[in-house]
């Protein structure tokens, strides 16, 4: 993926995350639940003082430090490995985008705005950036696993 496309994709993904959070805050009261796809997904507004899926509540200094380290390392890795396959680039793009999206909330608000509730399973409320991070990490693990198995 060319550097320009990577940067534009990063900006777009972070913007989508921030716009989704802005929309939730503007249209749903704190703690209110509104069905989006009845029985499947509801939207709610939650202020999360923890990490993805509400773990490690009230440890902001820890999350800021970890976020800076992970994003910094991902950018360093991209810069020093210019010929990564598209899947690793996509994984790192999602991880960086998700990290930046939640980092903006932490710096601006001291909490992260969460809004997606899966009605069909007992699961934490999460946001778009959490989704980026989750998919990015899963994709990276698959890439690394494939490398180990096949030497790619």
Curated annotation (Swiss-Prot):
Enzyme class of the recorded protein, top EC level: hydrolase
InterPro entries for the chain: Peptidase_A8
Metabolic or biological pathway: Protein modification; lipoprotein biosynthesis (signal peptide cleavage)
Classification via Pfam families: Peptidase_A8 (PF01252)
Active site: 114, 130
Subcellular location: Cell membrane
Keywords attached to this entry: Aspartyl protease, Cell membrane, Hydrolase, Membrane, Protease, Transmembrane, Transmembrane helix
Known EC number: 3.4.23.36
GO BP terms in the entry: proteolysis
GO molecular function terms attached to this record: aspartic-type endopeptidase activity
A Gene Ontology cellular-component term: plasma membrane
Lipid bilayer topology: Multi-pass membrane protein
Catalytic activity, as annotated: Release of signal peptides from bacterial membrane prolipoproteins. Hydrolyzes -Xaa-Yaa-Zaa-|-(S,diacylglyceryl)Cys-, in which Xaa is hydrophobic (preferably Leu), and Yaa (Ala or Ser) and Zaa (Gly or Ala) have small, neutral side chains
Membrane spanning stretches: 5-25, 61-81, 84-104, 125-145
PANTHER family in alphabetical order: LIPOPROTEIN SIGNAL PEPTIDASE (PTHR33695:SF1)
Family: Belongs to the peptidase A8 family.
Name of the protein this chain belongs to: Lipoprotein signal peptidase
Organism: Streptococcus pyogenes serotype M6 (strain ATCC BAA-946 / MGAS10394)
């Amino acid at each position: 993926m060319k550097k320009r496309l990577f940067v534009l994709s990063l900006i777009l993904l972070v913007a989508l995350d921030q716009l989704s959070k802005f929309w939730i805050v503007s249209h749903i009261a704190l703690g209110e639940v509104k069905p989006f796809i009845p029985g499947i997904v509801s939207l709610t507004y939650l202020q999360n003082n923890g990490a993805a899926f509400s773990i490690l509540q009230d440890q902001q200094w820890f999350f800021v430090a970890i976020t800076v380290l992970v994003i910094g390392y991902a950018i360093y890795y991209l810069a020093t490995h210019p010929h990564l396959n598209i899947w690793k680039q996509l994984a790192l793009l999602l991880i960086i985008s998700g990290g930046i999206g939640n980092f903006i909330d932490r710096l601006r608000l001291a909490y992260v705005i969460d809004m997606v509730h899966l009605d069909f399973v007992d699961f934490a409320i999460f946001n778009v950036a959490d989704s980026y991070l989750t998919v990015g990490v899963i994709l990276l693990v698959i890439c690394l696993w494939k490398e180990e198995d096949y030497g790619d």
